[in-house]
């Protein structure tokens, strides 16, 4: 095989023929990001980008190309480039630590990539013809990266010196138009005869081993190749020109000699060139899932990126937006790869072949693809701990509580190690700040505590902020209304100190007492008793007290004892069904009679239903006050039919509620249908009905109903509880007087008097969102981070908890918390009830009529 080098041709020259520039106007509100190091030279980043067009989910792999142990290689199916496979299996079989999908490929079988693949200085497959204009990305031996359109020339000479122009190597795209060359990198065996005529010439060590026509597939020799064609004239030439035992020569001329190329792979568009957005091809316009690969200016870092799209939470990206994102990530040159359903990034976080697909494939699963681009760690094995990282379940805790410590161990190459943390020693500074027992830090005095974990010569540190005792306790709920033996997770309990700092207190440190035997709390889960009652849970820690009022069970009101049929009527579906209701003394749970329902579901079409309607004309019974449930006794027949009720709300909207999905018992059983939360009262009980939709249950039967009751929450009681402890903000005052600067906010308007140490901007929530399209608003809010020694006020038109997307809340809080490092920050809104919550130095304040804040002698006071 003869390889020659010919001049490379710039991709831009070709792309200009069919493209036009599209500038990106993408506005980024904020990036939520996290990073995980995969090795000393490889890192994974996840970025959720809030933009003017919506949310983007961006996954990034960064690889240091100067590291001698880091390698880039194209990857493909271990069964050859003619076979598709999901990216995760390619990562497993190749040993890569991370990878993204490759370029365009033929979706049929056998598949082929549009671009070339060079791996370990070996040509695996050549690109499609030059006219297609797809660029090739190559790492050259001198450390440079070349992005250009290749124009290879492949020629094979028959035994009689006949010249055959071969369009591609290891692709069957041209097999019907001329000859193609297939090596063992294509597949283990040749295509062979199927429905179309085919001639295959087997070459071993440049000698014709066999000339085959319409034969089954044969093994492709490791030290040779197969020349194949289904084109009539080419097949005739091949039969005439290739003779068994005669020599053959193959000449492949590439833009670069493979010996000068570390690796090559194909791409779709050259989207960033020399640090600027390049001319963008008009192919695949619109916002879609995207994959891109870029390099920094000196080609020392490779940046692989996926952007999710076609998803309810993520909008995808246009090519122009992709180009801008690549520039923002540090790319000086970049290409985009195949996208859409092919966009995939996989990471082997623990280097154990357990690959995680970190993006969200738009098809809902990985697509089988033809190739990928992998990053490899070739570090020497080492089990010596070089670095220790410590994570705490809480970095801020109250004194005399605890925080869990989690340790991660790495060798000198930042490869994770599986080390038993029992072999680690700890040191706490100051020495009297606390102690570590079984990887749990127990603080013994307020202040800063530095914990050092060490093993051998390796160590890691973490600082824990220890708060003094809390003055108040907070929970997400102040009251509970539960049925009998119900369980309710109370969630985290938050302590607040005198300065407004807060931390979660583990439930094991909370003392729980009870008023009126309503139930019991274990590990933060309350279980109600089986007796109706009204009482309270009292939670205490140190001097802080919090009450939760609890109502258990129900107050019952009997609606019908079923002693007669007044106001009751039976209707059936389908109408030709049969059935009857009657009052009977045969079975009675309470009293002397019950309602007997005989039903016949044998004439079912799509379903069978027996309705017991309430009211003389089926108008129903309007229920008093606000019932929580409807209950009754039912004597079942174990026929497994569906027992339900229909109610209507104040607007006449019908709601169906289950008593039981299946009547699967014989004898009396109490059943309940709970009224849905949020329903608009008053409600009307329309009917009770037995239904069946399963045609295998066409049968007859009888059930009995007794003592229909409406269930209300228990009445309030005077509990005589001690007062809860409260947090009182030292900045809060009853009046703002003698100020040098003052801001008043009322009903969304504000009046500012003074010299400009108070900065106020407006935050607008509309339809559950702080719209990313409101660029002025977000720029104002982000400008808070640039101020120093100011009082910053964000006047909201509603509670930030009314924002539907938790990520928006997180963005807002991150911006405000960064601003609070050098400023005093307030978030205020008119909520009708005065309240102050301090979270990470940011004050969230609810005011009832107006909010006033003033400064005098650098002292800040506010009134809400």
Language model region names:
Residues 22-227, 552:
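Zymogen propeptides
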Residues 401-416, 451, 486-502:
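Beta-strand-rich structural segments
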Residues 427-440, 513-525:
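Low-complexity "stalk/linker" and mucin-like segments enriched in Ser/Thr/Pro/Ala/Gly
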Residues 551-578, 713-735, 743:
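Extracellular carbohydrate-recognition regions
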Residues 568-595:
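Extracellular glycan-recognition surfaces and repeat-rich motifs
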Residues 585-611:
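Short carbohydrate-recognition loop motifs
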Residues 652-685, 700:
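Extracellular carbohydrate recognition and processing domains
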Residues 771-848, 852-864:
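His/acidic metal-ligating clusters that form di-metal
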